[in-house]
């Protein structure tokens, strides 16, 4: 069985270069513009607040399209639409569920997540963690609107990261 951590090649292209603000480095964001006529509605995207979707994180690069955004489309069967600020509890929880996000996977260019990293997670996994009392904080402005098909806005608001 072959594991592919990235979407199919036609969409596996870099459309954003950015850095997630961290205490140990200067923050910057530079986005390479894609002409509007080439962007689908899901690429333009709205967040759960009905505003333009913001970037989630780029160190490490997150998102189904590995562009820093928690946007999704029908090829993303897991619906990686929830922008989380991962913590040790969630990393331990998801590892126990069979998805080890904290261990590096060099073959896929994945450094492993550390507490404080921003990462797009599956809406159903986040909801499962919520139901088990293990859900991490979320950045509402970076959670794609499709998340609301799985998780009520009130629940997300209750786990909003400070400043969100």
Located regions from the model:
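Extended boundary segments
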Residues: 35-89
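Short, basic/aromatic beta-hairpin or loop at an interaction surface
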Residues: 86-100
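Short alpha-helix capping/helix-loop boundary micro-motifs
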Residues: 102-109
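Short, compositionally biased
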Residues: 126-149
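Glycine- and charge-enriched low-complexity intrinsically disordered segments
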Residues: 147-164
